[in-house]
């Protein structure tokens, strides 16, 4: 009977210590093989927190499914900061270009509720607002109004590219 373990690991930097070791220790799987497979599959996310699901059988066989990092982690990575603002409506910690915002929306496409690029950009902008990140020098609310007005249609178009 298959069992499942869900963990959040730094892309390409998993090791046999916590959180993996304590979860995998009592299972029949080869911990080092699982760690190596996770690192191989997550190396593109280098250091960014990535959700990983490990499914294993009683015979020690396993499969790994890598999810998409949380939107906040992608925003922090793209903008180059570690911690969001304590007062996100007043103190801004970074600014993203519309192209950077679109890149994040494309990476998050499988997890977003949006049906087009404009709404996907607005979803990501919502996360930017809570972190204290501006978009094109404007706060997220102003940015979203401009998206609604069609100001960024030339960049956002209709569809997101496949991630």
From Swiss-Prot:
Cellular component GO terms, alphabetical: large ribosomal subunit
Pfam families hit by this protein: Ribosomal_L11 (PF00298), Ribosomal_L11_N (PF03946)
Keywords: Ribonucleoprotein, Ribosomal protein, RNA-binding, rRNA-binding
Region entry Disordered, spans: 1-26
GO process annotations (BP): translation
One Gene Ontology MF term: structural constituent of ribosome
Matches recorded under HAMAP family: Ribosomal_uL11
Role according to the record: Forms part of the ribosomal stalk which helps the ribosome interact with GTP-bound translation factors.
Self-association state and partner proteins as the record states: Part of the ribosomal stalk of the 50S ribosomal subunit. Interacts with L10 and the large rRNA to form the base of the stalk. L10 forms an elongated spine to which L12 dimers bind in a sequential fashion forming a multimeric L10(L12)X complex.
Protein family: Belongs to the universal ribosomal protein uL11 family.
Name used for this protein in its record: Large ribosomal subunit protein uL11
Gene symbol of the encoding locus: rpl11
């Amino acid at each position: 009977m298959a069992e499942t373990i869900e963990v959040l690991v730094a892309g390409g930097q998993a090791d046999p210590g916590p959180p993996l070791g304590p979860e995998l220790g009592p299972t029949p799987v080869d911990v080092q093989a699982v760690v190596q497979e996770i690192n191989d599959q997550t190396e593109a996310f280098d250091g960014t927190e990535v959700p990983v699901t490990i499914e294993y059988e009683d015979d020690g066989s396993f499969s790994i499914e890598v999810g998409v990092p949380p939107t906040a982690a992608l925003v922090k990575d793209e903008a180059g900061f570690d911690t969001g603002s304590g007062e996100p409506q007043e103190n801004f910690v970074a600014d993203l270009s519309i192209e950077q915002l679109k890149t994040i929306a494309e990476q998050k496409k499988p997890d977003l509720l949006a049906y087009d690029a404009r709404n996907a950009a607005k979803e990501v902008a919502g996360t930017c607002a809570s972190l204290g990140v501006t978009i094109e020098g404007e706060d997220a609310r102003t940015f979203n109004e401009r998206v609604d007005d069609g100001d960024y249609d030339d960049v956002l178009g209709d569809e997101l590219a496949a991630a």
